[in-house]
UniProtKB/Swiss-Prot annotation:
Its main location: host cell. Residues 80-92 have a biased composition (Polar residues). It is a single-pass membrane protein. GO terms for cellular component: host cell membrane; membrane. The chain crosses the membrane at residues 30-50. Residues 1-22, 79-101 are annotated as: Disordered. This is Movement protein. Keywords: Host membrane, Membrane, Transmembrane, Transmembrane helix, Transport, Viral movement protein. The keyword Transmembrane helix applies. GO terms for biological process: transport of virus in host, cell to cell.
Amino acid sequence: MDPQNSFLLQPRVPTAAPTSGGVSWSRVGEVAILSFVGLICFYLLYLWVLRDLILVLKARQGRSTEELIFGIQAVDRSNPIPNTQAPPSQGNPGPFVPGTG
């Protein structure tokens, strides 16, 4: 083959558009998409793992999971709730009749 024919058979590749000197929009889109995916991954990690890990670590400090308070206020153990019995029932009061009461 002569060089002139081989030049005609090669595919023509378009030249790139001139850059405007700023950040390309494809790069901005790529960063936005990766940030969004990273945020979703962090949220799912918290939802599935970190929340339970926080509860386990708080329970190991001597608190039960019912007493957990996220903040500064601590649980007051000096005044426990008394274990009172329910008042005795007065028998079957019967059906509720409006206006008799």
